[in-house]
């Protein structure tokens, strides 16, 4: 059985503006000099939770959580305007650039696994590795 790491607090919280009117909530915890790992939550419409930080060893990883457009602490909440898959992939890349990360590990669950795979297809040179759980590929047979 998987044992999660102890609860930790973020050392950084911020909002970054993407396509208007959207602003993404981003937090970082763990080791600022560690291996960067981006946690992509499920949904659409979900959000991150404090327990999402506990998947990673905080001594080894720079843990990055964000709330997707319209989700969690990102604003505006539940807004569908300019909230589509292509924009979400662009948002992930904007986060990487904003945080000045050369390459990172992508961790996605459910809808987050779909976004992680799509991001890795578009930017394979920027991805050190993929960790996927509860994989959802958004195919007809997955939906029906």
Predicted regions: what is each one?
Residues 8, 87, 110-111:
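Short, glycine/acidic-rich beta->alpha junctions
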Residues 18-76, 96:
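Conserved HGGG/HGGXW glycine-rich cap/lid loop of the alpha/beta-hydrolase fold
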Residues 77-89, 141-144:
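Catalytic nucleophile-loop/oxyanion-hole region of alpha/beta-hydrolase
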Residues 102-141:
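Conserved hydrolase catalytic core segment
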Residues 2-28:
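N-terminal cap/lid segment of alpha/beta-hydrolase-fold proteins
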Residues 86-104:
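Conserved acidic catalytic loop of the alpha/beta-hydrolase fold
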